Structures are given as C-alpha cells and as structure tokens.
Amino acid sequence: LAKLACEETKLGRWEDKVIKNAIATRFVYNDIKGQKTVGVIADDPKQEVVEVAEPVGPIFAITPVTNPTSTVLFKIIISMKSRNPIIIRPHGAAKDCSVEAARVCYEAALRAGAPENCIQWVRTSTQEEALALMAHRKTALILATGSVELVRAAHRSGNPVIGIGPGNVPVYIGKSADVPFAVEQIFISKTFDNGTVCASEQAIVANRANADEVVAEFKKRKAYFLSQEEIERLEPVAFNKEQKVMRAEVIGQPATKIAEMAGIKVPADTTLLIAPLEEVGIHSPLSLEILAPILAFYVAEDFEQAIRLCRQINHHGGLGHTCSIFSQNEERIEYFASAMNAGSILVNTPASQGALGGTYNRLRPSLMLAC
C-alpha cells in the first residue's frame, strides 16, 4: 500500500509511509482492542450513573493525498470498532491506493463476520457530489481531512463534523536545550515522508544564545540555508500568495527537486531547505504551512520574543493544531504550553512522529489531528 501510494501520488517516501500504515493499524489496534465502545461502558453504583454508548450511524470520511492509505486504514478501523458503517471519499490524486486500502479492510472485515457493505467507497466524485454526501440526511458524522476550504465546507453541511485541517507548527529551541539532540529530532521529523505530515515543524525559533550552534548542527545534516535572493526565488514556487495556499507541485518532494524548480543550485545531497526570516504572514510566505522539506528559521533575542514569534506562527494557519519545544526548563515548558493555542504541545520530540502518537510518547496513536 505504501508503494502504491507513492507511485500514484508521486509524494513522499514509501519507506516512511510503511511506518504511517503501521501506526494507523497495528498501533491503533493495540491501543483500542480492549476498549468497550458499544453498550454499557461505565457503571458507577455509588453515583447511580450508567454510561451507555451506541453507534452514531453512517460515517462519511474524506481522506487526503498526503497520507492516503494510512488515513483510510485509521478511519475504517475506528469506525468498525464503534460499529459504524463508513463511506470513504478519497482525494482524486490518490483514489487507486485509497480504494485498495479500503478493499483490503473490507475483505478482512467480511472474513471476520462483519455485515456486507459496512465499508464502502466512492472511487470518483465531483465537488458537488461530495458536498451532497456531506449534507445527506442519513450522514451521521463527517470525518474531514484536508484543506481549510474542505473542512469549512464540511462544517457548513449541517451534519456533525470532526475536522482535520492544516497546521503551521512552530518549534522553539530554548537556551537550555540540548541543541544536537533537538536538531536531530527536528531533522528526523521534517524529512519524514518528505514533510507531508501536517504536524511536521514549519518554523524553527532559536535563541540568540544558541542560534549559531543550531545552524551548524543543521549544516552537519546537509541542510541548505537560503540567501535572501534564493528565498525570493523559492517563494512563488512553493506558495500561491493569491490563493493563500502552498503549491501542490512542491508537496512531498525532495529538497533537491524543489531547489531545481526554483532555479537554486544546491549540493546533490541536500536534505532540507531553510529560509532565515524576520517576518511572519502572507507577505513572507515561507513562514506559512508548506508540506515539504522546507523550514523557516527565526532568531529570538530572548524568551519573550520567542513566545511572540511562536504565537504569530501558530496563529497564521496553525490554531488548534500542534506546537513544539526543546528545553530542559520545566517552568519555560509550562509557560510555552499555556501561551500556545494548540491541541498538542510536544516536548523534546520530533513533531511528525510525536503528534501521531504511540512511538515517542504515550499519546493515543491517531491519524486524525483535529483542530
């Protein structure tokens, strides 16, 4: 399935998609297999309260091009566990691999005794048809993973929605951080599947006291720091300022290919493109979410400025999603967590893998990072 996804979408690395598929299946299964989801799930005789769970009904699940098979697998497993039928609507550029993932699950479900048609899929559909399915009176719940426009459309459908939208993830490398460790973890995360995880770091905020060391450590790992002229070349290639979205052509592509698209000469072994920036927002588009091995880089004079920068980055496209910090100072970590508007605050952890859960921490494994 991982190879099929790479062949069809031309995004990411199949070796990393294998890991995503494993998290979506094996890790999720081990996490929820003992959890009762239907019937009496809690009974408190002292308070005389009994909690009863029941299926919600047909689920309409929209899946993305960036994590196609893993998202299909995950949404099907949690739907079957809660006894809800599910209809998958895959991204048009990932329909074959997504349908194959759904077919594998459906055949396994039938062999295990599940009812016919418990898992269905729409191989092709227009935008109008997808909107009609979201608004259908028999749709009980929508699981919408995709762009801001898609998630907003789901919320306008009139049916209950769990929306999984974009993230613009800042990572702060504090003065007390173990810099070589921090850079290694960010490198592992941002190069994972060529940066297609929406929880991957988008902007580094270093402290003035350790900025030079951070730069040196990234260069050891073949990261390429862009000049101002190169940043100006890359911006229109990576981001559409008129539509305020990253360009599909760079999503999940290797750093060397993206540099070539922008007419930037980089060494053949370049792993990341890093853009030193001073501003945040649409006027500085590399500060926004780009699901590729591209990172913005800021230097803060002190902790207070670092917080302001991280809040700005978080605000521009990442509200409710993910933020990350590398620090050994517990008070600073707690303050950072309280200052960010994010569903997940990751500490001393690679954001891509850490946000998915089940590997670097004890967060529940999930391919739906809701915001």
Question: Where are these predicted regions, by residue range?
Answer:
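Short secondary-structure boundary segments
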Residues: 91, 146, 208, 348-351
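Rossmann-like NAD(P) dinucleotide-binding subdomain of oxidoreductase/dehydrogenase enzymes
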Residues: 40-181
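Structural motif
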Residues: 57-61, 77-78, 84-87, 117-120, ...
